[in-house]
Each structure stands twice: as structure tokens, then as C-alpha cells.
């Protein structure tokens, strides 16, 4: 499964660290530190890929705005995670396909643990969780044009 990365200036340093751990990840930008860049640009690039079913996404900004942008795309379930247990549950219970890490509040070692937990987690396929995902899909179908 491909993993797409995106970050603004507040997440840039952490994204560069993440690329060292996830060597096969595809970096969609920013490719250089730019204090004037805007988080929606890079969140949208990642979310487009995930929305089309091309892989999973990890977006990094300061405090969570990239998750807001990613969730504007059909088939995207982006969750902001500060802890590995939250990331594990986001994948298992909510089929999270875009992980958002707030670089202002998460150090690189913690980010590595969060990503590892999220990547290793499996989506729960029992009736209860599938029912909830189906309801989410129905809401999405009604509200995304």
C-alpha cells in the first residue's frame, strides 16, 4: 500500500524525519521549507490520492487544519492523533485512511510510535463496526455531490 505524505511549514521538519523512517512513502510536498505556504494545498494533494483509492495518507501541520481539509474529500476519513492508542483505534474502529499529526505538539519519537501503531492496526470487520462504516458511507453519499 502506498503512503502519501504532505506537510506545511509547521510540519515540514517532522515530515522530513518521517521520510527517513518510511523510505517508500511518496512526498507530495512541500519539498522545501516555506514559511508562507498554506496547509490546505498539501492536505488536498494527499487527500486526492487517498480519495481515489491510491493509498493511505499522512499529513503534518501545526495543530490540525490538514485533517479538516482532508475530510472535505469523498472516501477520506482523516483523524488527528497525538498518541499511538488513538491512532490504533482510529484505524480499527473508524477505518481512518489519513493520519494527521500535529507537529506543534508531537515530538519525532512519538510521531514514529503513532505511525507504527496506525500502520500495524487492522480495520475491524465485525458487524457493529461495518454497520457504522456503512452509515458513514450513506451520509457521505447524501452530502457529497
Where are the regions that the model predicts?
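Structural motif
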Residues: 2-3, 55-59, 76-79, 96-100
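C-terminal binding/interaction regions
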Residues: 4-17, 84-145
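A general structural signal for well-ordered alpha-helical segments in protein cores
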Residues: 15, 39, 43, 66-67, ...
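Non-catalytic beta/alpha edge segments that cap or flank active sites
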Residues: 17-22, 29-30, 84
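A short beta-strand-loop structural module common to alpha/beta enzyme folds
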Residues: 24-39
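Short hydrophobic/aromatic-enriched beta-strand-loop microsegments
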Residues: 25-27, 76-83
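Glycine-rich phosphate-binding loop
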Residues: 45-73
